């Protein structure tokens, strides 16, 4: 208030010494009066802010202390009898029941409620009891990148109430406990883990608790109870699961193993009949007399008791049959032994079905077709079986190996819905990747193309001066060009003097290399200041200004791809059992040649400093395949195909003779086939991706006035 008093004294003194006329006096009084009012308002505002508590979004219930999972100090709370309970909202969708405005900064944050034990004061019953499995789930979230101790910044809320197994808690009391949570708000943005829903006699496929608008991470969904795009299907965990070193390609005696104990009787009868008809290929097991769940005994007397789940490694396929409950722990037990699941459960929503392609690692068969299962399995080739076994092994180690992995996978599935721009592609979710570099995209790509920087044209030339000068003149008029760098790859002859080059308005620089290597075109020269690089041969003079400008605009939208003009395809020849390079026009492409293509300068660094094996040296020695090597490199890291732009397919230099053009040599073509075969062996796989599309301008070939088209001169074939 000191500032206000000083201002008032100043006003008083001003009035005392003022000797102006009445009109000026009135104006001065009004001015001083307004200043006094503003000063008083500011003073009261500052006083209010300094004296009032700064309530957060949850009105003072903020807790910024990191949660400690101390089982010795669990808070005991009484269930609020007046808390409103609402049944599960079966119509919930991602857009209706999830408040995405709580999910800020492009990251998923989960708040975990403190360990609490809700007690009914009338019956003195506890709502739920914490199991070791749920403790592991809480611990996994607590130690993950998703956890936040501040509910104000949380996107999701995870109760510490253990609802994994509906058989061990009172569902009515559990619903009341949920409604008593501080931030429940009808379950909005809350996630509930449940693996064993329902109970006798109905065995519902979803948790029989009043969860209102909460998201269910459930292990027993069918197609009727699952809310697509909202709930997340998770596996039913097995306490008997052990990590054993089963081999995906190991010799397995039986085609099909059946060791599930709770298959419905009508299906067991069918399996008994199949076992009699295929006794050498089907191993049918049941419970032993001592009811030891870690052992299985044959329904016939041909085999001794076997240890479970190790026995599953004896079969190529293992059956998951229909039982009273939809979800069963047998699925993860089967996968732990790298056995291919044969799923004979109609309408079962498989774990993480939204992102995992189960057709690559399982066989689904309708329940009423169980009698034909052996016939269907025999029709699968041995090569396909090995592929599926490897996929099962990879999926298990990636998403199912322990409760921590299951928990974090479920959260990532939900995160991919909330932040789709950061989501992994289906290929990334399902592709076995033996190369560490291809597990992530190294480029930090914005959701929208940034403001154009332009591109640097890097021209590789040797001695074709006339063609080089013509190309420079054509490039200079491209609006998006920033500069030109000429790589003079001839050590026996100096490049023409800069004064003899065409006079252009864009910066032009010349570098003479020390050795004649094709890899020189991909060296990250310091003269390259843009992210976009157009690598172009000195004889590619047929491209128009619009074609080049449009190609750059496409690259801006897909900067992690190779974007260009000449396209090729790789094919497998069954006769020679080798990969073949094909330049004929087909409906598919898998490579874009860097004789005229845009790429990010990051790939120049990778090509120069991190090319696998001896690929770079081999390219320089044979003076061939540098463009194929670049396509392999980018595809291996990103798992993305190149993008061809515009319909042009002919790139022959009109002034060049056939002997001048390297691609006209038949030996050159044979070497390129050998390159593809050699590179695939070095990478240990075929990383090239095949696509059946190209990019053309929106109004391409439309009956539209040329003046209204941005790109008129797209050229011909």
UniProtKB/Swiss-Prot annotation:
Membrane topology, Lumenal segments: 47-717
Cellular compartments annotated: Endoplasmic reticulum membrane; Golgi apparatus membrane
Xref: InterPro entries: Exostosin, Exostosin_GT47, GT64_dom, Nucleotide-diphossugar_trans
GO MF annotation list: acetylglucosaminyltransferase activity; glucuronosyl-N-acetylglucosaminyl-proteoglycan 4-alpha-N-acetylglucosaminyltransferase activity; metal ion binding; N-acetylglucosaminyl-proteoglycan 4-beta-glucuronosyltransferase activity
Tissue: In wing imaginal disk, it is ubiquitously expressed.
Pfam families to which the protein is assigned, alphabetical: Exostosin_GT47, Glyco_transf_64
Names of required cofactors: Mn(2+)
Disulfide partners: 625-675
Binding positions (UDP-N-acetyl-alpha-D-glucosamine): 464, 489, 516, 521, 537-539, 626-627, 672
Cellular component GO terms, alphabetical: endoplasmic reticulum; endoplasmic reticulum membrane; EXT1-EXT2 complex; Golgi apparatus; Golgi membrane
Glycosylated residues (UniProt): 91, 574, 636
GO biological process, one term: heparan sulfate proteoglycan biosynthetic process
Pathway in which this enzyme or protein is active: Protein modification; protein glycosylation; Glycan metabolism; heparan sulfate biosynthesis; Glycan metabolism; heparin biosynthesis
Entry annotation: catalytic residues: 627
Family, similarity comment: Belongs to the glycosyltransferase 47 family.
Name of the protein in question: Exostosin-2
Annotated source species: Drosophila melanogaster (Fruit fly)
């Amino acid at each position: 208030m000191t500032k206000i008093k000083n201002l008032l004294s100043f006003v008083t003194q001003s009035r005392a010494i003022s000797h102006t006329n009445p009109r000026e006096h009135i104006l001065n009084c009004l001015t001083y009066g307004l200043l006094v009012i503003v000063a008083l308002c500011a003073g009261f505002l500052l006083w209010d802010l300094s004296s009032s508590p700064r309530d957060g979004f949850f009105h003072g219930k903020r807790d910024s202390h990191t949660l400690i999972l101390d089982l010795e100090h669990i808070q005991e709370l009484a269930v609020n009898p007046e808390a409103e309970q609402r049944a599960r909202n079966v119509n919930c969708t991602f857009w209706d029941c999830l408040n995405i405005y709580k999910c800020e900064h492009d990251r998923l944050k989960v708040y975990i409620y403190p360990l609490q034990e809700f007690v009914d004061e009338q019956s003195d019953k506890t709502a739920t009891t914490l199991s070791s499995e749920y403790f592991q789930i809480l611990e996994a979230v607590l130690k993950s990148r998703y956890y936040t101790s501040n509910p104000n910044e949380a996107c999701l809320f995870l109760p510490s109430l253990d609802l994994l197994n509906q058989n061990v808690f009172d569902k009515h009391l559990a619903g009341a406990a949920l409604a008593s949570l501080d931030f429940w708000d009808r379950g909005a943005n809350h996630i509930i883990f449940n693996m064993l829903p329902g109970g006798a006699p109905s065995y519902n496929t979803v948790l029989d608790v009043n969860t209102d608008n909460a998201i269910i991470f459930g292990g027993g969904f069918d197609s009727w109870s699952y809310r697509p795009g909202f709930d997340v299907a998770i596996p039913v965990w097995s306490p008997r699961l052990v990590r054993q070193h089963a081999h995906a390609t190991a010799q397995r005696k039986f085609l099909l193993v059946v060791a599930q104990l709770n298959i419905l009787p009508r299906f067991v009868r069918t399996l008994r009949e199949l076992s009699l008809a295929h006794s050498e290929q089907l191993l049918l097991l049941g419970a032993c007399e001592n009811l030891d769940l870690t052992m299985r005994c044959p329904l016939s007397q041909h085999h001794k008791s076997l240890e479970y789940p190790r026995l599953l490694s004896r079969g190529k396929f293992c059956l998951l049959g229909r039982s009273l409950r939809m979800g069963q722990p047998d699925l993860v037990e089967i996968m732990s032994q790298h056995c291919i699941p044969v799923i004979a459960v109609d309408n079962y929503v498989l774990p993480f079905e939204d992102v995992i392609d189960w057709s690559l690692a399982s066989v689904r068969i309708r329940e009423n077709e169980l009698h034909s299962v052996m016939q269907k399995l025999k029709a699968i080739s041995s090569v396909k079986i090995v592929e599926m076994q490897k996929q099962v092994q990879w999926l298990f180690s990636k998403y199912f190996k322990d409760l921590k992995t299951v928990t974090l996978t479920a959260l990532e599935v939900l995160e991919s819905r909330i932040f789709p721009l950061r989501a992994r592609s289906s290929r990334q979710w399902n592709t076995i990747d033996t190369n560490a570099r291809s597990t992530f995209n190294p480029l930090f790509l914005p959701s929208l193309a940034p403001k154009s920087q332009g591109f640097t044209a890097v021209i590789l030339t040797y001695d074709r001066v006339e063609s080089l000068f013509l190309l420079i003149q054509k490039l200079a008029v491209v609006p998006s060009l920033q500069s030109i760098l000429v790589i003079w790859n001839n050590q026996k002859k100096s490049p023409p003097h800069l004064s003899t080059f065409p006079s252009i308005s864009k910066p032009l620089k010349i570098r003479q290399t020390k050795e004649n290597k094709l890899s020189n075109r991909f060296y990250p020269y310091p003269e390259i200041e843009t992210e976009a690089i157009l690598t172009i041969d000195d004889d590619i003079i047929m491209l128009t200004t619009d074609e080049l400008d449009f190609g750059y605009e496409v690259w801006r939208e897909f900067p992690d791809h190779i974007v260009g003009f000449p396209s090729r395809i790789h094919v497998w020849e069954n006769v020679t059992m080798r990969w073949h390079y094909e330049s004929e026009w087909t409906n598919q492409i898998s490579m874009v040649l860097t004789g005229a293509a845009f790429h990010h300068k990051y790939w120049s660094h990778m090509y120069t400093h991190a090319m696998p094996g001896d690929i770079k040296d081999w390219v320089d020695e044979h003076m061939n395949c540098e463009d194929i090597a670049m396509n392999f490199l980018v595809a291996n890291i990103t798992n993305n195909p190149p993008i061809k732009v515009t319909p042009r397919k002919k790139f022959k230099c009109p002034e060049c003779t056939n002997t001048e053009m390297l691609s006209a040599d038949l030996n050159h073509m044979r070497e390129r086939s050998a390159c593809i075969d050699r590179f695939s062996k070095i990478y240990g796989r075929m990383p090239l991706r095949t696509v059946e599309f190209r990019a053309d301008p929106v109004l391409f070939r439309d009956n539209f006035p040329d003046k209204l088209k941005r790109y008129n001169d797209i050229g011909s074939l």
